[in-house]
Amino acid sequence: TYIDYLYNKGNGYESALDELENNRQKEYSGNAFLEVSKDFGSHFSATASLKVEYFKSDYTSNGMKSTLWNDWTLFPNATLSYTVNPMHIIQLDISSDKTYPSYWDVTPQESPINSYSVILGNPSLKPYRSYSGQLIYILKQKYTILAFCDYVPDYFAQLPYQNTSELKNVFRYENMDYQLQFGVGVIVPFRVGEFWNSQVTLAGQRMQEKLDHFHDLSFHNDKYTGQFKMDNTFTLSKSRPNLKLDLNGYFVTGAVQGIYDLCLLYTSDAAD
C-alpha cells in the first residue's frame, strides 16, 4: 500500500515571449493504492487492486483563470483464475488505466500544414481512462479463446473541423464522449518441424465512438471489423551461424476514428 503526491507547474506553451509570460498551466495529482491476493485451494486464485487518484489542472491565460480538470477516479484491477485441470484453465482479467495527452497535443499553438489546413493544440484536452475486461479459456496450455470488452470514456483523437471565420480546415485533438469495443478472438500456435514456428490470431469486434457536441455537429460512428495476425519464425540454420527469419503480418477489415470510417488496413515486417 502506498500514497504519493505530485505537483507539476508548466509556464507557457506558446513560443512567443509575451505569450509565455501570460499563460500558465498547473497540474496537481495524488493517489493511493491497495492490493490483495489469495489462493483458495489448488484450483482457484485471485488478485485484486484498487487505485484512487485525484487530478486537477488550472489554466491561466492573460490573467483569466479556469479549471480544466478536477476529477476523482477509481482504477480497479483484478485477475481471477480457475484451473479445472492442467488441460483446462479459465481466467478473468479486469484492468484500468489512464492515458495523458502529449505536450504538443495540449500546446495552444497553430502549425500550418498548407494554405488551407492547420494543426491546432487543445489546452483543455483531458486525459482519458480505459477499462478493459477479458474472459479467457486456455486449452491444453496452448490454445486460447477469449471474449473482451474495452470502454474508454473521454477518449481523444485528432479530428478535423471547418474554421467558421476563414476558409481553413483545423485538425485538433478532441475528447469524445466514449469509445467502446467488444468482441471475441482465438489464438492458435503451431509448429511445422524444426523449421517453422507460428502463431495465428483471429478476432471479430464491434467498434463504437460517440461525441454529442463537436463544433455544432455530433457523431455516433460504429462498425463491425475483423482482424487477422500471423507471427512466424523460420529457422534457416541451427548450426553456426544460427540464422532465423521473423516474418509477421497484420490485416484488419476496417476501423472508425471519430467522423472517419477507415477502410482495410494491413502491415507486414521482416527481420533476421
Task: Give each language-model segment a name.
Residues T1-T47, S61-M64, S81, K210-T235:
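Outer-membrane beta-barrel transmembrane domain signature of Gram-negative proteins
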Residues E27-M64, D71-S81, P86-G133, A147-F171, N197-R206, T233-T253:
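Surface-exposed extracellular loop regions of Gram-negative outer-membrane beta-barrel proteins
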Residues Y13-N22, D58-L68, Y116-P123, S130, ...:
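Extracellular loop and loop/strand-boundary signature of outer-membrane beta-barrel proteins
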Residues A16-E21, K26, K126, I145-K229:
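Outer membrane beta-barrel strand-and-loop segments of large Gram-negative receptors
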Residues Y266-D272:
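Conserved small/polar residues in nucleotide/adenosyl-binding loops
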Residues T1, A46-L50, P76, I90-L92, ...:
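Transmembrane beta-strands of outer-membrane beta-barrel proteins
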Residues I3-Y5, V52-D58, S66, I94-Y100, ...:
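Transmembrane beta-strands of outer-membrane beta-barrel pores
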